[in-house]
Regions:
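Short functional hotspots at interaction and active-site rims
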Residues: 1-165
Length: 165
């Protein structure tokens, strides 16, 4: 399945169609500690609830090696939010005849979203199951999280505006 997917994607690239990779990622508002201290042989326990401050979810589209668009949401991503993002943010920014690639998340399968993509004359392709390694945007999310760890006070919208991710 993976080989067939790569072969088909390569055919689209050779025909000159832009390939757009889409994915979402969550960013914690407060970065958890990675180290702690305890007596030798004892487990290290923390009393701070690191998840209590919430998280921001990002949806992005990657063309080549750069983000075409990134949108931030305080809510969990669902079919309605994703469909509206595709319609209002992604599609107006795409060049004609793109191949849009995304994973098989449930909210990526909305009928309205599929129809919007088809009506805009783009091709929708889903990654093979359990194949995040075939989606280069995953590496961009990892880069963004690394930069954020180094610069803890940077806001997410600023992070995506000023960095060359």
């Amino acid at each position: 399945m993976r080989r067939i997917f790569r072969w088909r994607l390569d055919r689209h690239k050779k025909s000159g169609k832009p390939i757009v990779f889409i994915d979402e990622s969550g960013f914690a508002h407060d970065m958890p500690r990675t180290h702690g201290y305890a007596l030798k042989g004892k487990r290290c326990y923390g009393i701070h609830d690191w998840g209590a401050k919430g998280r921001t979810n990002a949806i992005g589209a990657l063309v080549g090696k750069a983000f075409l668009t990134v949108a931030l949401f305080s809510a969990n991503i669902n079919t309605d939010i994703f469909t509206q993002w595709v319609k209002q943010d992604l599609l107006p920014k795409l060049p004609p005849g793109c191949v849009i690639v995304m994973d098989n998340a449930t909210f990526h399968k909305g009928k309205d979203m599929k129809k919007d993509i088809k009506n805009a004359n783009h091709i929708l392709k889903y990654l093979p199951p359990y194949s995040p390694d075939l989606n280069p945007i995953e590496k961009k999310w990892a880069q963004a999280k690394t930069v954020r760890k180094k610069h803890k006070n940077i806001e997410l919208d600023t992070l995506f505006k000023i960095t060359k991710l």
